[in-house]
Design a protein with these regions (language model features):
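Helix-loop-helix hairpin linking two adjacent transmembrane segments in secondary transporters
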Residues: 101, 130, 138-186
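Extracytoplasmic
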Residues: 11-45, 66, 230-235
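Juxtamembrane intracellular "pre-TM" segments in multi-pass secondary transporters
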Residues: 2-6, 187-217
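A late C-terminal transmembrane helix in Major Facilitator Superfamily
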Residues: 327-365, 369, 374-375
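Conserved MFS/SLC helix-loop-helix module at the cytosolic interface between two early adjacent transmembrane helices
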Residues: 61-100
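Cytoplasmic helix-loop-helix junction between adjacent transmembrane helices
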Residues: 105-146
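Helix-breaking motifs and short loop linkers at transmembrane-helix boundaries and internal kinks
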Residues: 42, 74, 95-101, 112, ...
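Paired small-residue
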Residues: 85-92, 100-108, 306-312
């Protein structure tokens, strides 16, 4: 384990947060520009939800390659290579002559930033364990929330004053700066002597055979799928249904995100006081409450800012509680397979979110009920996954006692 000193922790966290921020900003920065982009490419506004799906699916799938590869050759070269792929995709998006080319560019972008999804979980496990690991994961979760806060507001400002293309110009510049920062200042967290050359399928079988890991993976997939579906749908509901201007959409879009920050902060504080099971229950309860808040007005055919944004705020609190807690508990048992475990977590989580947003894009984008229904289903899946985890723990205790 390459333990980070307290003096280096700040730099380590800063570099990790801006590295993750590239992928997160790319996911949501275009949302306020959806009406303008739809007009430019001659497609329905609802079709722009496919941009997020085209981004998230390779973002998830690529992590299955990045994780085991990083266990073999180290974290740093994988991180830098992924950023280069992202920059190529961003250039293509900037000059895309058609909607199909934009989708291809989003696919390449997601394939590149998938490295941040895998490595964000892996490098923290390289350097920390136990309570320190949960603390660092919570700090990272709180830190990275500022990029989704900034992205829609900045995207709305840029698209309103400079056109939607300026969003991709910004992403290109920001991505280039982060790549240079990683090349210059980010040290390798996996020493040569700790690297593993075993076959990929052996690593995956070892990680996936853990019953509790299976439960936490499902929990994270469902939680993030709900978040991503809201991000893909809210812009259409606020901009195309309620006819709000891009600036207003961008500000409303970020209102739920402090809920995630609050949940992440609470997850770290409450874990020591209440214990794992109670913290996970609180997160699950918040997800259910937020989903119900959104679906009830939708059942009456209504789309209201209060229920949509208020329900999402509560849902995001639950997500903020669950993400650092479930990630830490899932990856904790795998100090020598951190890359593979991180890849499975990030890969399946984002693949599931991509498929959920793809399914949402096929539904009516004019209905708040559809969004509430998806969030409700995701919350129920989280409940079932936590039940699975509890039963697995009892099963393991029974085996040890026999």
């Amino acid at each position: 384990m390459v333990k980070q000193s307290s003096s280096n922790m700040g730099k380590f966290l800063f570099l990790l947060i801006i590295f993750i921020a590239v992928g997160q900003m790319t996911q949501t920065m275009y949302v306020p520009a959806i009406p303008e982009m739809a007009t430019f490419f001659g497609v329905r506004a609802a079709s722009l939800q496919a941009v997020m799906a085209a981004y998230l699916i390779p973002y998830g799938l690529s992590q299955f390659v990045y994780g085991p590869l990083s266990d073999r050759i180290g974290r740093r070269p994988v991180m830098i290579s992924g950023m280069v792929i992202f920059l190529i995709g961003t250039v293509i998006a900037l000059v895309a002559p058609s909607f199909d080319v934009l989708l291809l560019a989003s696919f390449i972008q997601g394939m590149g930033t998938g490295t941040s999804g895998a490595m964000s979980r892996t490098v923290t496990r390289d350097c920390y364990d136990g309570d320190d690991l949960h603390k660092v994961n919570s700090l990272v979760s709180m830190g990275v929330i500022f990029s989704p806060l900034i992205a829609p507001v900045l995207g709305g400002y840029l698209s309103e004053h400079l056109g939607w293309e300026s969003i991709y110009i910004f992403l290109l510049g920001f991505g280039a700066l982060v790549t240079l920062a990683l090349m210059r200042s980010f040290g390798e967290t996996l020493p040569v002597e700790n690297r593993r050359a075993e076959r990929v399928w052996v690593s995956y079988r070892y990680v996936l055979s853990n019953r509790r890991f299976q439960g936490y993976v499902v929990c994270l997939i469902a939680t993030f799928a709900g978040v991503a579906t809201f991000e893909a749908s809210a812009g259409v509901l606020l901009g195309s249904v309620l006819k709000l201007d891009p600036s207003t959409v961008s500000w409303l879009f970020i209102v739920p995100l402090p809920g995630y920050l609050l949940g992440s902060w609470g997850s770290n504080k409450l874990m020591k006081r209440l214990g794992t099971n109670r913290v996970l229950f609180l997160g699950m309860f918040a997800l259910l409450t937020g989903a119900i808040t959104i679906i009830i007005p939708g059942m009456e055919g209504l789309v209201t800012v209060t229920s949509l944004i208020g329900g999402a705020f509560i849902y995001f609190i639950g997500a903020g509680v669950l993400f650092p807690a479930a990630t830490t508990l899932a990856i904790q048992p795998f100090p020598h397979h951190a890359g593979t475990a991180g890849a499975v977590l990030g890969g399946l989580q984002n693949l599931g979110a991509g498929l959920a947003t793809l399914a949402a894009s096929a539904m009516s984008a004019q209905s708040q009920f559809n969004l509430g229904a998806v969030l409700s289903v995701m919350a129920i899946i989280v409940v079932l996954s936590l039940v699975w985890i509890r039963r697995s723990e009892k099963h393991d205790i029974t085996i040890l006692a026999s």
